[in-house]
């Protein structure tokens, strides 16, 4: 999980999810693209 100041979808498979006021990017096909906004 990368923690970044700004997150964006890297591929079409990425999903943008809001949990507890934070924005997450999750990708089932390529889990190394997981991100969380700072």
Curated annotation (Swiss-Prot):
<dbReference type="InterPro" id="IPR035977">
    <property type="entry name" value="Ribosomal_bL36_sp"/>
</dbReference>
<dbReference type="GO" id="GO:0006412">
    <property type="term" value="P:translation"/>
</dbReference>
<dbReference type="Pfam" id="PF00444">
    <property type="entry name" value="Ribosomal_L36"/>
</dbReference>
<dbReference type="GO" id="GO:1990904">
    <property type="term" value="C:ribonucleoprotein complex"/>
</dbReference>
<dbReference type="GO" id="GO:0005840">
    <property type="term" value="C:ribosome"/>
</dbReference>
<protein>
    <recommendedName>
        <fullName>Large ribosomal subunit protein bL36</fullName>
    </recommendedName>
</protein>
<keyword id="KW-0687">Ribonucleoprotein</keyword>
<comment type="similarity">
    <text>Belongs to the bacterial ribosomal protein bL36 family.</text>
</comment>
<dbReference type="InterPro" id="IPR000473">
    <property type="entry name" value="Ribosomal_bL36"/>
</dbReference>
<dbReference type="InterPro" id="IPR047621">
    <property type="entry name" value="Ribosomal_L36_bact"/>
</dbReference>
<keyword id="KW-0689">Ribosomal protein</keyword>
<dbReference type="GO" id="GO:0003735">
    <property type="term" value="F:structural constituent of ribosome"/>
</dbReference>
